[in-house]
Amino acid sequence: MKEFLKVLANYVLPYKKYLAGSLLFNLLSAILNVFSFMSIIPMLQMLFGIEKTQYHFIPWDTAGESLKNILVNNFYYYTTLLIQQYGASTTLLMIGLFLVTATFLKTGSYFASAAIMVPMRTGIVRDIRIKVYHKILSLPLSFFSDERKGDIIARMSGDVNEIENSVTGSLEMLIKNPILLVCYFSVLVYTSWQLTLFTVIVLPVMGWAMGRIGRKLKAKSLYAQNKWSETMAQLEETLGGMRIIKAFTAERKMNERFDSCTNNYRHAATKVAVRQASAHPVSEFLGTVLIVLVLWYGGTLIFSKHSPIDAPTFIFYMVILYSIIQPLKDFAKASYNIPKGMASVERVNKILNAANPITEKGDAKPVGGLKDEISFNDVHFAYKNGGEVLHGVSLKIRRGQTIAIVGQSGSGKSTLVDLLPRYHDVTGGSITIDGTDIRDLKIADLRGIIGNVNQEAILFNDTFFNNIAFGVKSATMEEVVEAAKIANAHEFIMESENGYQTTVGDRGCRLSGGQRQRVSIARAILKNPDILILDEATSALDTESERLVQEALERLMKTRTTIAIAHRLSTIKNSDEICVLHEGRIVERGTHDELLAKNGYYKRLNDMQQL
């Protein structure tokens, strides 16, 4: 319950005006409901001759009479006058019209209370999705190394929907039902405290039985949602690896794997659904037991000579008692739904509560560009729950220099350059820009002066224009076209069906690898960064595409400080300095010719590529 109240505090309070409106209309609905039921007693007593008492009007300000007695007496008095003047049949019709009017107002109030809750429910779901999405964008890259993308998607879709259906869906019950219970219970006590005392003794037994069924629902729901995440992750991997699956004729294997995930989810979801489905029949049965017990006890009282209530009042009491059963059933339903939804809240909170080690200091300094040098000072780095990847790397890069980093796969090249824009933070040593530790700089400013061109060109399912202008505010068409021309991309863009307004497809699937890379370079050119990071930007291209991309890169690198990672040594021969990284350490450094003369690691790498 504490977790549930915390969810309400976080997401419901911004919509308190809707809560207030719902409370008002629910209260009105409950009062009208009770008021219409109260007309049953005089109908039975007066119309069917059960009550023979002659009533006389009592002035409203009569001393010594309680308000209750005055109201009851005068109501019977006016009812008697109607019967005498218009007859029993007409009076019955009048009371029936009164009931119809009261019911119309009651149902109208109920509809208004439900309609008012709709904007709150949809707003809460929107708020959760936005909050999760914003959190995802703020998390470091290391988070996504530990989490499967399909699982994250499942939390944003399935779990958030479950929160809407279970938690916010139960919220309406939790607003309406307490009002109904208070009104109905007050009427029950007012009508017969003896019968109500008996009812109160029986109710806890029912509550215990209902609670026992729902106790394990949260754990079962959490397990089922985890299985659903595995299914979504499997689907995401299948869509992303479709080419490999077909190349290795692995359709059968993937089908079996997906079938297994789906069956596991089915079994888990079945257990949850069966337990949840037991809510209504169990509450129905227990409610009937309660009615029978009260009917027996009330009948016993009436048959006794000293009964505190008469038969019509007892019938009214039973009507109210039966009416109180439905709110209790709704509470029982909520007791199953809420734990199920809280399991989804727990999974969503795993994202929202994820720690972000990449933080910005309160007094972080702005940075407008690189004026002097970048310095890696005895840098050490280790991934979480892993061994150290970089061991005491020291490197100075002067403004305008091009530094190449080469080495075997797994030597730490990409990790080293990922430390500069603070995708990760060093675990030892420091990295400075113009003498200032990058951890003391504003993160947005730091990343704003760095441009990236990676081995895998990441494009969005958007137009050429928007992909090139990505991250650059108020970019004009002239600026985008100029960047595309420098990147050797303008020609094939103009050959597309709608030019710069052509959509490139999911992850740029409508383009070749070389075209995607040139669009990526155009994006970096438009950003106009002081520092450029090239991470094996031409390693996956054919000879012709590599030539065009290399030309674009050379234009991009002019007047910029560049850190280039390369497997093909031919692309970095003209670098001002080449650093050879081996097992997390710089083992050699110098120009291309100097390193060949050393006859060391670099020479061996070069000789292997000459074969």
What are these regions (language model features)?
Residues 1-38, 47-99, 105, 112-117, ...:
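Membrane-integrated ABC transporters
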Residues 13-17, 141-142, 158-167, 171, ...:
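An intracellular "coupling" helix at the cytosolic face of ABC transporter transmembrane type-1 domains
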Residues 21-28, 172-223, 296-309, 326:
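Transmembrane helices of ABC transporter permease
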Residues 33-41, 93-94, 98-149, 153, ...:
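Juxtamembrane helix-loop junctions of ABC transporter transmembrane domains
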Residues 48-52, 122, 130-154, 158-160, ...:
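Short intracellular "coupling" helices and adjacent cytoplasmic loop segments at the cytosolic face
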Residues 187-201, 275, 279-346, 351-352:
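Helix-loop-helix
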Residues 360, 367-611:
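ABC-type nucleotide-binding domain
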